[in-house]
Curated annotation (Swiss-Prot):
SMART domains: ParB (SM00470)
Domain topic, free-text comment: The N-terminal disordered domain is not required for interaction with BacO, BacP or ParA. In the isolated C-terminus structure CTP binds betweens helices H2 and H3 of one subunit and H4 of the other, stabilizing the domain structure and allowing interaction with ParA. The ParB/Srx domain binds CTP and probably ParA; CTP binding is required for ParA interaction. The flexible C-terminus (residues 426-489) is required for interaction with BacP but not with ParA.
Name of one Pfam family that matches: ParBc
Region (Not required for interaction with BacP, BacO or ParA): 1-239
Cellular component aspect of the GO annotation: chromosome; cytoplasm
Quaternary structure annotation from Swiss-Prot or TrEMBL: Homodimer. Interacts with BacO and BacP. In situ probably interacts with monomeric and dimeric ParA, in vitro interacts with ParA in the presence of ATP, and with ParA in E.coli.
Disulfide-linked positions: none
Family, as annotated: Belongs to the ParB family. PadC subfamily.
Record's protein name: ParBC domain-containing protein
Subcellular location: Cytoplasm
Record key words, sorted: Chromosome partition, Cytoplasm, Magnesium, Metal-binding, Nucleotide-binding
One GO MF term: nucleotide binding
Amino acid sequence: MRARGLFRGATMDAEHRVDGQDGTAGAGPEGGSQAPSGQDGGQGGAVSAELHASGGPSGPQGEHRREDASPESGGEHRAEGTPPAEGSEQRAEGTPAAEGSEQRAEGKPSEQGVAQRAEDTPSEQGEPQNAGSAQGQGGEPPVASGDTQGEGERPHNAGGEAPGSADASGSEGSKDQAGSQEGGLQAEGTTSQGQAEPPAKDASHAQGEHQAVSDSHGQDGSESGGRSVANEEARAEQSPSDGEARVTPGLDERPQGAFWTGEADGDKSGDSDEASREDVLPEPEQRLSGRVTTVLLPLEKLQDESAFKLRPEGDVSGLATDIARLGQLFPVDVRPAGEDRYQLVCGFRRVAALRFLKRDAVQARIHLRLSDEDALVMSLAEAIHATPVGPEVLEAKRDELEAQGRLSAAVRDMLEKALATEDTLAPEGVEEEIDADELAQEVAQRLGAINQDLSLLADVFAALDESRKAELLMQLRYSSELVTYLEGL
């Protein structure tokens, strides 16, 4: 009795759909997309789906179903006068209805995690389509009908098909006046355009893994599932990836400045290291920096040569007195010259004064890598810039210190010695009286000697250099002019 009642309900449902009338509570308006509803209690669509799934006979007026539908034909069913659509497939191939389809036919909502797909959406590679793409022209979203079950749902049937997956949709371009699109629900793993492949469970999971988020939230269509996927993608974009390092600002930054000489970071290229070294300012005396050592050098290790001596040492008694009283104030400059031998570059008078005092060591700056050119420049600079202090400056300083009360006995003695040295070096004054007759006699004798020398040069005058000739002629002209002048007196 129950089967007959279901058969009659399916027949009436098919007749009303062919005539374009609103026979069931779940039927869509004219031109709208129609899908069997599992939430609103539309028994007509659900009973029709159960009838097709159980292999019952087709309706007398509008529906024709092939019980021996092969996978190639896809088990299509359509109303009379309606051309077949690409997606209007019927997945039931004589499979008896499961208990889940009866429960959904009675108006019970599908379980959580059910996914919808419209058969009229082509899928070339067998990828499952979301039910949100199957909304009809009428703007009513289709309701999930329990095509595929998520985690915790009822298992698939032995045939690998989802229970109650009946095709209740027509073609979008149907010539019927009803004009309604009935979107059939297709199990995962099936392909459209009339090629029905048995959707295995493994194939469904292999090809539809990317719909896990959408299937877990898919009770009412693709709206809530789309929002969930969008939220997941937004959080994924905002959160840093696993390969990105979370760097705290300020901890990994290297110090800035012109004198930074530390190593650069590990993720920096060789070009940035060279740029940072170029920014470093050169240190003063870069040629000599790090290559000079000040030591107390034995005098016996100095070579007795004067390659860089510019003038003789002269009298070093005063310098020796100052060194004996004050010590050596300034070290000398040397450079290595063989094994345990050194060459003196600057400080010859200081070394002579130390030897005068019978000392055995001298304070010296050893220039480890000093070229001949640099050594010569150093010796010249010391001699040129050692400007002697004039007596006027020394006297002014003595008067200034005496006025300030700072002129001690040692300072006075040093200044007096310096002034005495200047007086001894001054030329003697001309105080001797000269006799003119004696001077004239002396000049006459010298002129006679010069005339004899000129007579000797007359024989070789033509062979002389032009510059020598000009110089002799200039002196003779001066003498001739002087003779004319003296004769006129």
